[in-house]
Structure formats: C-alpha cells, structure tokens
A protein has these predicted regions:
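ASCE P-loop NTPase helicase motor core
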Residues: 139-144, 170
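A short helix-turn-beta junction within AAA+ P-loop NTPase domains corresponding to the substrate/partner-engaging
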Residues: 143-157
Length: 216
C-alpha cells in the first residue's frame, strides 16, 4: 500500500500533462511494486536491533539495490534528525548506532543524498557509518567528498592505491607518502593502517599507525 501511495503522490506532483508519462522515479517505484520486496507495513525499528540486508539477488550496480539502500538510509536520516546531539565528555563520546555498507563503491558513484546526509548529520548524533570498499578511488566522488568526512580511515592491504586519496586522508607527501604506500603494501592478515591523530596534532612522527585486529 505504501509503495503504491508513494507512486501516486509522485505522479500528483508532476505537471498535469505529464502525469501519464514514465520518469526515472516512477520506473523505480514500479519495479519495487512488481518485486514485492517490502512489507505493506513498516514494523522494523532499525536502531534497536541488528539487521543484515542481503542484496545478493540484485545486480550490485542496478537500480533495485541502489533504491533499497536509498530508502534504508532515508529512514535512518529521519530517525537521527529528531535526536539530540550525542553525549560527550573529555574522554568519551556516545555511540548509538553503526551502519556498515559493504562494497560501498556501488553506492558512491551517483548522487546519493540520503547517504551524504547520514554521514553529515550523524557525526554529532552518535551515528557511525562504515563504508567498506576495495577501490579507494570511489571516495573521490564528484557528487560528495566522502573521504573528507572520514574521521577514522582504516586501510587494509591493497594493490591499487590512489596517491590523491592517501594525501588527503593522511596529510602526507613526498617521502612520507612513499613510506605509507609501502606500509600498506606490506600489511598482513588482520593488520590495518589508520590515522595517528595525536602525532598529527603534535607535529611529531608519522601521520599513521599500524594496528592489528583479532576475531572475538
């Protein structure tokens, strides 16, 4: 019912002479209706449980997968816009929710306004958005400067490295950049490289540090 109502509402907002035409939004809504992927009534409370949305049966770069992520991030935006800022003190900040988007490069190549808002609004609302991708070039999107909003970049071993992204993320150049690239190429299983914010603030040592993670 809600899906059809959204399509009807969008049609009503169009000029009268064009209400019978099929545009991009109506095309997506029509596919959502035909695939019957949403329940008639939304009863899921996204911030009070752990949910995995499996998009495996949809084309990763297709309109359906993008639409599902679009609607979920829109719902999260609506929730967090109503919340007060996160609680903080001298040592800690409140974390309310994590959203992890795997293979995020599929969601960075178009104007994904809900995702952009989620990152921008969520930063002081206790909302953490983790964008996982093997292609760091994707963060230099023409639609939104995602990596400029990356407070805690975590770099795993990868062969394809983008000098521009690494420079912007870690504030390095010249010899320091080459050392960082060598460190990334030499990472082992379970090892990550992240910013060393204390070293950056003090202007001492390297701008990055290596950490090792373990399975719990």
């Amino acid at each position: 019912m809600m899906r059809r109502w959204r399509q009807w509402k969008h049609t009503r907002l169009m000029p009268e002479k064009k209400q019978g035409d099929m545009d991009g939004v109506k095309s997506v809504l029509s596919q959502l209706i035909r695939n019957n992927i949403f329940a008639d009534e939304d009863q899921i409370v996204l911030v009070k449980g752990c949910y995995i949305i499996n998009l495996g049966k949809f084309d990763k770069d297709g309109i359906m997968a993008k639409a599902i992520v679009y609607f979920v991030t829109s719902k999260l935006n609506n929730i967090y816009e109503e919340l007060p800022p996160q609680a903080t003190n001298a040592e800690r900040v409140e974390l309310r929710h994590f959203t992890v988007i795997d293979e995020a490069h599929y969601m960075l190549g178009f104007k994904n306004k809900p995702l952009q808002n989620l990152i921008a609004v969520g930063r002081n609302k206790g909302k953490s958005v983790i964008l996982a991708t093997q292609n760091m070039d994707s963060f230099k999107s023409k639609h939104f400067d995602f990596y400029a909003n990356a407070q805690y970049p975590l770099i795993m071993k990868q062969q394809q490295q983008n000098d521009g992204v690494l420079k912007d993320l870690f504030g390095v150049s010249g010899i320091a950049l080459q050392e960082l690239k060598q460190a990334i190429a030499g990472l082992q299983k379970g090892e990550l490289i992240t910013k060393d914010n204390k070293a950056i603030a003090l202007g001492l040592g390297k701008h990055w540090k290596k950490i090792k993670v373990t399975r719990f």
